[in-house]
A protein has these predicted regions:
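N-terminal low-complexity, Ser/Thr/acidic repeat segments characteristic of secreted
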Residues: 7-9, 23, 36, 40-43
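N-terminal compositionally biased, intrinsically disordered segments and leader/signal-like regions
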Residues: 15, 32, 37-38, 318
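Signal peptide processing junction and immediate N-terminal pro/mature segment
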Residues: 18-33
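Long, low-hydrophobicity ectodomains and other hydrophilic envelope-associated domains
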Residues: 38-330
Length: 330
C-alpha cells in the first residue's frame, strides 16, 4: 500500500492530523496539525483527485461521482472508476481505502463483511450466511437537474426491486375449467406447484387473470404476483462493513479488497466497503435490485454523494429482502 495511504489510515484512527491535498497541480502535499478552529472550515480533500472530502463540521464524507448507467440490474450503487460500471449507477475516480479512512476519521465503527461459508475443518467449507454488519451509513445524493435546480434525495430512491425477472406464487392446482391465456402469458408450473410471471404486471393484466376464476386461492396468487412485480423503492440501509485485506504473494504488500470496485454495494460481497444489511444475492440471475431509471439524471451527470454515519446503534432494522428471482421451469 502506498505510504500516503498508510498515513491516511493512521490519521483516521488517531484523529491527530489531516492529509491536505493542494488544488494546484504540481504542489506537494503536506501533513500538519489541525487546530479545532480549522475543523469547521471547508471540507478537506483526502486524495490528489479531490474526489473524497472530509467534512468534519458537517459530520459527513463527500464523494464526487458521476452517473455511469441508468438502466441496469445492479450489484452496486457506486463503483470505482473503470471497474464495474456495467452493474452500477455511479462511478468515482478514487481509492476505496481512502473512503474507508475518511469514514474512520468521522468516528464510524467498522463491522464485518458478509459471510457465505465457514470452515468447519481444514479445507472443508459449509454454507453459513451471516449478513454484513457495521455502523449504519445514511447516503444522500446531490445533483443539478436539467434546469440547473439543485436536487437532494436519499440514495434508496435511485434503487428499486428488480422487475425484469420471473415472479412466482404458490398454487397447488389450477381451478377447474381455468385455461391460462397465452397473451399475456401466465404460466402454471405443475412440478413446483406455482404460478409464474415475468416482468411488471399491469393492472389491466391482473384484471384479466382475476376474471378467470372466483377461486380464493387462485385470486390470492394473482394478487401476490401483481404486488411483488411492481417497481418498489429499496428499503434496506447501508452499513460500514469495511471490506478486508489480502497480502500480495509477489509483492508481499497488503491490498485492500474493495479496490476491485466494490465500494457501495446493493449485492452482498465480502470485499464491500459499504453493503446493505440484508441478504442480497451477488449472482447475476438472482440479483435483487435494479436502477430506478425514471428518477436518475442523464449519464455523465455529476453527483455529490454524502456519507453520514448514524449515531444510533445498528440493529436488525432492515426489512427482509424481496423474494428471490427464479427461472421458468423446463
Amino acid at each position: 500500500m502506498n505510504r500516503w495511504l498508510m498515513c491516511l489510515f493512521g490519521v483516521a484512527v488517531t484523529g491527530v492530523a489531516v492529509v491536505v491535498w493542494s488544488a494546484e497541480p504540481g504542489q506537494p502535499r503536506e501533513t500538519r496539525k489541525s487546530p479545532a478552529t480549522k475543523r469547521a472550515a471547508k471540507p478537506v480533500p483526502l486524495n490528489p483527485q479531490g474526489t473524497v472530502l472530509l467534512d468534519r463540521a458537517g459530520k459527513r464524507l463527500l464523494l464526487k461521482a458521476s452517473v455511469c448507467a441508468r438502466d441496469r440490474v445492479l450489484e452496486m450503487l457506486c463503483c470505482l472508476k473503470r471497474t464495474k460500471e456495467h452493474e452500477s449507477i455511479l462511478t468515482i475516480d478514487a481509492s476505496a481505502a481512502v473512503v474507508h479512512a475518511g469514514l474512520l476519521a468521522l468516528g464510524a465503527r467498522q463491522g464485518t463483511p458478509v459471510r457465505h461459508y465457514k470452515e468447519v475443518s481444514p479445507g472443508k467449507l459449509v454454507a453459513d450466511f451471516k449478513p454484513p454488519t457495521g455502523q449504519q451509513i445514511e447516503i444522500y445524493l446531490q445533483w443539478k437537474d436539467k434546469k440547473g435546480i439543485p436536487r437532494r434525495v436519499r440514495a434508496q430512491q435511485w434503487v428499486r426491486r428488480a422487475t425484469q425477472r420471473y415472479f412466482s406464487a404458490p398454487l397447488a392446482k389450477l381451478p377447474d375449467g381455468v385455461v391460462l391465456p397465452k397473451e399475456p402469458e401466465l404460466v402454471f408450473d405443475v412440478k413446483n406447484k406455482e404460478l409464474v410471471w415475468f416482468g411488471t404486471m399491469k393492472p389491466a393484466q391482473r384484471d384479466i387473470f382475476l376474471k378467470l376464476s372466483k377461486d380464493a386461492v387462485f385470486r390470492k396468487a394473482v394478487g401476490r404476483l401483481f404486488g411483488e412485480s411492481q417497481p418498489t423503492e429499496m428499503r434496506a440501509h447501508w452499513v460500514f462493513a469495511g471490506s478486508g485485506f489480502i497480502v500480495d504473494m509477489q509483492t508481499k504488500k497488503k491490498k485492500y479488497l474493495a479496490e476491485n470496485g466494490n465500494l457501495i454495494c446493493v449485492a452482498n460481497f465480502p470485499s464491500a466497503t459499504l453493503d446493505i444489511a440484508q441478504a442480497s444475492s451477488d449472482k447475476g440471475s438472482n440479483l435483487l435490485y435494479e436502477a430506478f431509471i425514471d428518477r436518475i439524471p442523464p449519464v455523465n451527470t455529476e453527483v455529490l454523494i454524502e456519507l453520514i454515519p448514524k449515531s444510533r446503534p445498528v440493529g436488525k432494522t432492515s426489512p427482509p429482502p424481496p423474494a428471490k428471482p427464479r427461472g421458468l421451469p423446463r
